[in-house]
Structures are given as C-alpha cells and as structure tokens.
C-alpha cells in the first residue's frame, strides 16, 4: 500500500502519500517575528543601554548611571487598542543614579550662625544652595559630613557628603558629593501580540525583515581592458561607519610590472595603503618584515615620501591622510591622528556588529585560505614543538585537523603601533608556496587570531585584508559573490527596533550632557534629567512611516502568515527598485532551503521581495540557515539535525531527501544526486556528509500548498502561490480534498486560529467563549465575531471542540476565517469540466453553474468601516443631531432620535449614517430673524450639513456602531482623543457578496480567469449519472501554460471524492503516475478520467469524452463590485483642468493616445474634437454645453482646451511669444479663461471653485448648473495670488 492513514486532528483523517518518512516537524512559522522581538525585549534594549550608560558630563564632574530598567504593564489590552484605534504599548521605566563631585568654597559669615559651629554653617549653606529646608544631618566621620535631603515622601531622599579639605579663617574649602536617584520614564514602546503583529492606531502592522549586505571584508577582481592588467579590489564594510576600499593600480604594463596598492577612506581620494599603516605608527621596516618584503608593498612605499625619521614620517602621513578625507582643511599631527582613530576605532562611530566580526574572522583567518596549498614552513607551538611539518599539503581530508591546530593561535606575531589605538595586537603568520607543484617561491599569509572579538575594526584586520589582497594573484583565497546568502544577512524585527532605540538614546545622550552642563545640579531632579520625547518620536516615526512597517495583508490566514515571513531587499540601507540589476533578483544556488525560488511578486519588485522557505531559520548573526541530517558512512543519523548557513554548506556534499533507504537509515543507492559548492554532483554513498530533511524545504509555505507543484511550470506556480494569498474567506469554508499536508501548520501559526496554550479539559463552549481547565487553572478564550480585518474581510472564529474534550498544547480549538476543522480552507472543491462552451470561456473566462450561487459556495462577507469625527471648530462646536437643514424626513428615515443609524438597517448609496451639523460663521441677526430663531429654534440656525453618508458601492446592513467620547472632567470614563475632537463615531456596514459575472477566480496552479457567464442549472452539461458540472474551464488554457498539475489534481480529486476520502500529496514527494492510476481504478474511473458529458440544453451527449474532475477553486479579492465605476460630473485636475482618473477620485475613463488613433482611423473629426474639448478641458465650453443640454438648446462650438493654454504658457516660459493670427493676418487674443471667472469660498480643508461667475456669499448658491472642483487648499493658494480678502 503506497499510503498510510494520517490523523490530522480529532476531526480529520486523510490518506497520506508522503514518501520521505523522516520529515522533520516544521518550526514555529512566525518565530522570525516573535523570537526576535523577545530577544529585543530581554537583551537588545540592555545592549543599547550598556553602550550609553554611564553618561558623563562634559567636564567629567557628574555621572549618570543606570541601576535597572523594565517594562510595566500595558495600559490597554490588545482588544481595547484595536477598538479605540490606539497603540498596544507598555511604558519603559529606568532607575537612574546621578553622582556629582564638586569643589566648593563655603563662606562662614552667616547672620546668626556661630562660625565655629561647622555643622550649622554647612546646613545653612545647603539650605541656600538647594532651596530646600528638609535637610537632615545623618552622621560625621572625621572631616566628612553626611546629609539627607527629602524632596517628597514617596521619593528616595538625596544624599550629600561634604569633605572639608581646608579650614580657612573666613571659609571652608570642601569637596561636595551629591547622590540623587529616582525612576525615569523612557517612553511607551509598542508591544508585539502573540500573533507576531503590532497594533498601531488600531490597525495590525507587521515589521518585515530586511535582507541586506552583511558587514565584513569583500574581495573582487576585474580586467582593465586598456592595459590588460588584472585589478584587485578589497572593501571592508561596517554596519555603521567608515568604509575602507583597497585597489591595485594598473598603469604599469608588462609581465614584470609591479603596481602599487591604494586605499580610499570613506569614498575620499586615493592614498597609498602603506601611508595608512605608517599613520597607525607602524614603521617602514616593520611593514616590510611583517609582509616578508612583498614587492607590491616595496613599490607602494616608494610612492610615500619617507625620509627615515619615524616621527617626521608619521607626522607627514597622518596629515596627508587627513587632507584627503577632509579636503581643504588642515590640522596638527596629533589632531589628525585623533580624527583618524576616532572614525575607525571608536565604538560609537564605527560598528562592525557581531555578524561583521564573525564574517571577518571567517574570511581573514588563515585556515580558510590554505585549502589545496602546501605549507612552506614547520608550524610550531609555544614550546617550538612541530605541530604541522613543512611541505604538508592541505586537502579536504586533513583541513579539519589543521584548522583545530591553527585555532590555538600558533605562529602569531605581536604588532607594534600607536598605544592609543585599541584592539587585538596579534596576527597569525604562515608561509605557503605560491605554486604547489613547483614549491620554489613562498608567500606569507597574515591572518586574524582566534581571540579577535572586537566589534570595531583593528589594525590586525587591516593587515590581514592587505595580505589577502596581495595573495589573490597567486590564487590564494577567493573572490566573493555578493549575491550568495553567506554574504547577505537578515535584519529581523528585533535588530531593526534595536537600531531605532539606539538612535533615540543617541539624541537623549546629547540632551542629558547639555542639561548636566547647564542645570543647577543641587536643585535638579533625576526624573527631569531625561526627556523621553526624542526616543518616542523616533519609535513612532518608525512604526508609522518606515518602509519596513507594513499594514498587514489580512485577506486570509495564509496572506497574514506570508507577510510575517517576508524578506525584502528594499528599504533604508537596502537596494532601490530602479538600481537593482538582474543578478540580485535572480535565484541563487545558496537560496536552496533558505529562500523560496518561486514565491515572489510579479512586476518591478520581482526577486527583491522574497519569502523564507518552510524550514529556514535565522541564526544569531542574521544569516539564514536550513536543516540537514548528518550522514555517517552512508547511514542517515535521524537524531542529528544541524542548521547550516550558505558558507558552511559549501564545503559539504549534501544528498537529496528522496534517496532509497532501509528502516535503519542506510542509503541503498550506490550513486546519489547531490550538491557540492552550489553545483550538482553525482556522489558515492561514502562521500555524503549531509542529507536534506524534507523535499519541501526548498519552497515557502504558500508554494508548498500547491499539489503536484513538480508538474507545473515555475511561472505559473509563482502565480498560484501569490493568488492563494488573495483568496477571500468564504462563509462556508471547505478544506481541499487534495491537500499537501501543510494546511494544519499554516492555520495554527497564522495567528487567526485559537490554539490551546496548555493541556486541558474543555469545560464550556459557546460561539463567543471557550473555557478550559488545565494545570494553570481555569483559562478563558474569547472568540472574534464579525470583526473587520485590515482588508475589509470578516474575522469570525468558531469552536471545533466540545465540552469534555481533552485538548493538547498547540492544538487548534477554534477555527479562524478560511479554516475548516483546524485546516486552512481558502476555497471550495467543485466539479470542473475542461471543455469549450459557445465561446463563453474564450481567453481563460469561466462558465459557472447557478447552483454554486444558490448554495452560497463562494459567498463572502465584507465589512466596511465609516468614521465620523465631531470637532470643536472656530465657529463653534459640531453636533450629532437628527435636525439637519434642508433634509427631508424620507432621507432621515434610518436615523434615531440622536441622529445615528439603527443597527440592522439596510442602507443604500447616499443614505445618511450619522447626521452632523457644523456651525457657519455667525452673522448679526435682524429682529425678524431673531423672532424666527426664538420660535423655530434649531431649524433656522446658521449651520451646514456635514453628515456621514454611504459612499458608492458601500450599500449593506449596519452591523455595529462604536462611539468614543473624549476624556474630560465631565466624562472621566472617556478615551484620549486629539485636542479638537469631541467624539468619534464608527459605523460598520456588512455586505454579503455572492459570486457574480466579473469576479476573478483561480485554482492553485496559476490558472486564473474571470466569470463570464452564470448558467441556469438545467443548461449546464452533466454526467451520465445526472451529476451536474459546477464550472467549465477552457482546455486551451493548459498546454501553453504547462501547468499540468491541475489535470492531475482533478483526476485525484474525483477519485478521492468517489471514495469519500481526503488525501495528502506533498510537493516533490506525492503521488506518482502509478499510484494515481491505482486510486482512479479503485474509484472505478476509466478512460484516464475522461467521461461522456450530456449537453443540458439539447440532452445530446457531446461528441468526444471530456476530462471532468474535482478542483479546489478560489474566489480572489478582485471583485467586480469594487472595480465597477461610472462618472457624470466630478473633480478636475487643477492645472490641466482635465477630469481626474481612478475610482477613488470619482474620476473618468482616460481617452488616451491609442483611442485617439482609432477615431482618426475612422476619420471621425467632429467626435474627436468634441472629446478633446467640451468633454474634457474646454472650461467655458463644457459649462455652456451642460446648459445647452439642460435647456434643450443647440450645442455650442468648442472653445480652446485648457491644455493648450498650459502648453502656450510653458512655451512663453522658454522665451517664445505666442499669439494667434486670424484670416486677415491680424493678431487676435487667445480666448483663455481668466481667474476672475472664479470665486473662492473656504470650506474647512477643501476649497470649492465654482465657475461661470456664480456669486458666492454665506448663503447657499442657487444655480441651475455649476462646475465643482475639489482641490487641495495649498495648491490653489499657490496657483492664484490671492490677497487677504479673497483668501
């Protein structure tokens, strides 16, 4: 039997056709979010605080130290933050201690104080100095006096110690030490929810991880086409700080030519590499000794003006380098040296990070450069014992042992340079033969010792880099591939937040130093020394404005999960879309098991936005690792799983997971397809080091949800993976008959399901709560009920356990949207026939049966949120009311007494949801008006209707209303709102959308299409047994697209449906052809799954048998209700006066260049003229035409389009005068509209321009026709020079 029955959970079991039995269970799929944020909270913040504290004042007399810090409880719960549109955050507090040390001269002459009574003198002086009378003397020890100053009973008292140094006749010379401590607020910090998201202003946001170039040393070479010489390059790149770029010169030509070595410091002008070493205080002789008189360095030193006096040489080189970096500036030798040291060796300015140090040690240590080389000297230990003999060749077999010896820092030499340069002062030096065959000439390798751990650059790093570069021409070392994942690292949420926190503290650090310098330290409070605003501002800016902080894609659980696992190469410090070439976008061999080669966007971001593979993890240095099982002597060690980076992997031979093996893990094949150093390799069993853990480890979660992925063309699989994320949650979710086995894990880790937090027994279940009893006691889970997602879909959770069930930790106890019994269910299983139907499925269109609509198979629920703010304006307070001027009772029929729509009301476009009036400027009332006002009250008030109405396409049923009133003395239970807002009202309107013509659907194989026709059930073709077909797809959509997976899916789906089974066929290891034939035979299917279909309209059978089966189809979020749009009169662009575009702007359809060609081809001159003038931007013409139509008059002649005026003004701007000449040769004016034709009335933030000289005052304009334009206030004020009256 080729399958086994697998129990997915308590409710679901499937036939599992998995071939590789040793599949590793998947890691936590959102671990890249939750684990790194946990690191940030526990270690990341501490690291940054350790960098900045203690803070010293400029003069060194005061020091601010950090005693401890921590988060306090969040002020709001996650649910409250979402409902009130707030941030889910927690305050950070730190306990700080300020120590001040000062020398003071204290005068003895105080009125009424005995000069001999020192204690009284000191107490009196302290009272004056601190302005505080609560001073308590604690004790005296010889000449030291100890005092306590109480500020508040709730706070710790300040301690002051006064040591008398000298007792003069009229004064005391004292050393005063002040110790203040207190709790300081460092700001509110957003917290991550359990689902890996942040709640920012009520919306769920995700911080996307960024894939960037790792700090480290990189080497390259290229041919100079002019001279034919090879140029070698080396870059030392930090995470933050100065770049060092080395390159060899190529001016001298010939086999004997030796070119010098140059360096650029931070993109400045070139200087010789040796001048930098001389500037560090390494003498010329030491340089030559370290490098064994290397010919390139000898040549380079000749470029430096060296006279032999160390001090003078050092001074000249330091100043020379300073001039190159700071062009046009001069400095003393000491100043220049200090500057160079500060930009390279100061931790604050130069940050290599742990990852950078790891990469430098990996690249520049000798053990990684000597493979396939012959050692040219005995390698000795400290006692001169030979560890590795001369002439030993380093091979794959002995490299591990030699590496262990070199790790003991043998053959290291001490470096002599300036004492004020920090860092490791040892390098390793070993000689090897330039040519392993001839063994004549030797070259020395300088490498880092194992003890180098600094997170800044050291002189040892610079010497090792120079050595590496000099030896590249002897093929010692290798050129770097920048696109290799060993050279790119992931900045996860934790690191990105840590960087922001560091920037915030950097600003606080500057402010604190200024405060310590300017404040009276006797009176200052610890709690006021730090102002947290710079930190909270930077954090807020990051969450609200950063390219990496994204509004979470929440169409369905899969899109949410994918968003959290996304990697982007864009963003600050990354690439830009325009500059990224093909190489960086391409699939690289090192992506295997780390980044999915299939799931990436189509379009300008292709290859720049990627997704983590299923098993991939990010290690402590930010490099992506993937798991492999160890293989020893041809036997797979199932219990030894190792996570390797791309760099570690390249030295091993790795087999694919689908090898033949026995029950003990012994590999049965003799020759195995494997990978070595990024290439395919046919290996013998005994050569294998590792084996993949699973065939699906190379693809992402979404891609591994495509059954028969191996039978689909990659382009279509890419579309399939992307479209699964766009599937709308349906009201009756149905898990796929043909699944891949990832559905349970994807649903569990998405954050939308409710997962048991511990082993427990279910005590109570209803539609809103589940109560369990476990080790930690009674636990209540609250379920969401018709909550709105970020994308307007409905988030509803439904329980799948019953009272008395025993649940395990990590088990799904309530389904979220698009889930069925704990499995991801983003579509429906429908009967599909591949046949044409009267041309209705031309070009991928889909013909559907009405039965699907009636049964609500593809019906989805969508919730729209409409918000109304009640403000306090200059004219007075806005008001929510039912009394709205000039509104009929019919229009107000849905409003209650307060002016708010009732829950459950069915509303249409234009209906009022909330009535609101805004006061206009109050005018002096005449006696008659006052009388009317007294009689009728509200109705005659001078107010404007500003009600909230249902926009186009927003009809539905009012589901809920939320009101948030501002916190005030009268309303202490209110919430914090901006100063001018009194109340916020949110109305939620729910729509039930059945599937209809124009909606987009797809399968999981990139087979997408638009519904073109929904046929009555009786007209649909049906099988001979009467089973009606649900969907007809065009068979021509398969061969050229090469997504054959869909054909295999319909056959397997049909067979499984007939057998009443559900199946699992994982990617790359699912059913093969033979097994598919077996299950089809078991289900009684013949003729390769093709059947005779009967035409529903004629009752006749079709001529040829047709492929019919069950396919999992998805309804995508591109629905015709959101796209359909019409316009009659609407807004116009301010400059060209042409109608705006797009549905959001209520714009028109563009009649573009190609459409103009069509009319030109027909010779339709009058139609064309009309379209280009009165239907577009002939301002007067379009008003006159509207008037003519309304009054049934003749359509006037078109005038001059505004675009022509814009063009003529642009030509005038170039200095050409343009005018028109009539038939007689006379100049005539071009009729352009004049700004006098416009009156401007200021309406809040928008300005209404009304044309046709309509006069506007505070009263409503009574005009039969008017042309309205909504534009931005600033634009118009800039465009027309308005004086104050007009404005």
From Swiss-Prot:
CDD domains per the UniProt record, alphabetical: RNA_pol_B_RPB2
High-level lineage: Bacteria, Bacillati, Mycoplasmatota, Mollicutes, Mycoplasmataceae
Protein's gene: rpoB
Keyword Magnesium assigned: no
Protein keywords: DNA-directed RNA polymerase, Nucleotidyltransferase, Transcription, Transferase
Primary role: DNA-dependent RNA polymerase catalyzes the transcription of DNA into RNA using the four ribonucleoside triphosphates as substrates.
Domain of life of the native organism: Bacteria
E.C. numbers: 2.7.7.6
Protein name (record): DNA-directed RNA polymerase subunit beta
Pfam families referenced in this protein's UniProt entry, alphabetically: RNA_pol_Rpb2_1, RNA_pol_Rpb2_2, RNA_pol_Rpb2_3, RNA_pol_Rpb2_45, RNA_pol_Rpb2_6, RNA_pol_Rpb2_7
Alphabetized GO MF terms: DNA binding; DNA-directed RNA polymerase activity; ribonucleoside binding
Family under the similarity heading: Belongs to the RNA polymerase beta chain family.
Top EC class, one word: transferase
Keyword match Transcription: yes
Entries under InterPro entries matching the protein: DNA-dir_RNA_pol_bsu_ext_1_sf (IPR042107), DNA-dir_RNA_pol_bsu_external_1 (IPR019462), DNA-dir_RNA_pol_su2 (IPR015712), DNA-dir_RNAP_su2_dom (IPR007120), DNA-dir_RNAP_su2_hyb_sf (IPR037033), RNA_pol_bsu_bac (IPR010243), RNA_pol_bsu_CS (IPR007121), RNA_pol_bsu_protrusion (IPR007644)
Regions annotated as coiled coil: none
Subunit architecture: The RNAP catalytic core consists of 2 alpha, 1 beta, 1 beta' and 1 omega subunit. When a sigma factor is associated with the core the holoenzyme is formed, which can initiate transcription.
GO terms, biological process: DNA-templated transcription
SUPFAM superfamilies: beta and beta-prime subunits of DNA dependent RNA-polymerase
GO CC annotation: DNA-directed RNA polymerase complex
Reactions this protein catalyses: RNA(n) + a ribonucleoside 5'-triphosphate = RNA(n+1) + diphosphate
PROSITE patterns: RNA_POL_BETA
